A protein has these predicted regions:
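Cytosolic juxtamembrane N-terminal segment immediately preceding the first transmembrane helix
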Residues: 17-46, 50
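Extracytoplasmic
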Residues: 38-72
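Small-residue-rich segments within alpha-helical transmembrane domains of MFS-like 12-TM solute carriers
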Residues: 51, 55, 149, 153, ...
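Central cavity-lining transmembrane alpha-helices of secondary-active solute carriers
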Residues: 80-97
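C-terminal ends and interior cores of transmembrane alpha-helices
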Residues: 113-149
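Intracellular juxtamembrane helix-capping segments at the cytosolic ends
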Residues: 170-183
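Glycine-rich segments within core transmembrane alpha-helices of 12-TM secondary carriers
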Residues: 189-202
């Protein structure tokens, strides 16, 4: 009976060995300056393109007004759609929960997927939908923006921009966690500064 009680559990013993080995592998990866800065360049580049796509439509207001027939209210609605779901549907709150539960890899892929889908919808709206098509019997009264019978391209572009905004803002939170994970104990403040500076280039 004593022999059975003192017999080691091979399964639990192997698990104990695997855990330290995994921790050592991760520690070595983050200790490599090349890998740290490579990871930083990837996430910084992602945020740079996200900011670029967010702001690229601002100088095109006159072109959108002339080419698509959008008025000032429609353009204002489109511009504000970026943060619409994040503010009113609390998407960043739920995104933070997803990040804590699922980790940076899953959340990072989710952010990229949302940005690609949103950008594709927005591109389709401004390039393929008939500029003369309008949505009849549609009325929107949102704070100072009032829209009656808006252009179809405007509503679809706003939807795409909202989806893109969810991915872009959640990506900002994810990038902060990625940097803190890779650079804690190293050049954390420098990495944060480089990321912000690179992102603002967009």
């Amino acid at each position: 009976a004593e022999g059975r009680q003192n017999k080691p559990d091979n399964k639990s013993f192997s698990n104990k060995i695997k855990r330290p080995m995994n921790q050592i592998a991760k520690a070595k990866l983050s200790d490599s300056a090349v890998m740290r800065w490579l990871a930083l360049s990837i996430v910084s580049g992602t945020m740079m393109f996200a900011y670029f796509f967010t702001d690229v439509m601002s100088p095109l207001e006159s072109m959108l007004s002339e080419g698509l027939g959008w008025d000032a209210n429609e353009y204002g609605f489109f511009s504000g759609a970026y943060g619409l779901m994040n503010v009113f549907l609390l998407m960043l709150f739920f995104g933070g929960i997803i990040l804590d539960r699922m980790g940076v890899r899953f959340t990072g892929l989710l952010c990229c997927a949302l940005m690609i889908v949103g950008a594709s919808v927005k591109w389709y709206a401004v390039s393929h939908i008939d500029p003369n098509a309008v949505v009849e019997n549609f009325h929107l009264d949102l704070f100072i923006i009032k829209i009656d019978a808006p252009h179809t391209s405007n509503l679809v572009a706003a939807l795409g921009f909202s989806i893109f905004g969810i991915g872009a803002e959640l990506a900002g939170v994810t990038v902060s966690k990625v940097i803190s994970k890779w650079f804690t104990g190293h050049e954390l403040a420098l990495a944060m500064g480089v990321q912000v500076a690179t992102a603002r280039l967009g």
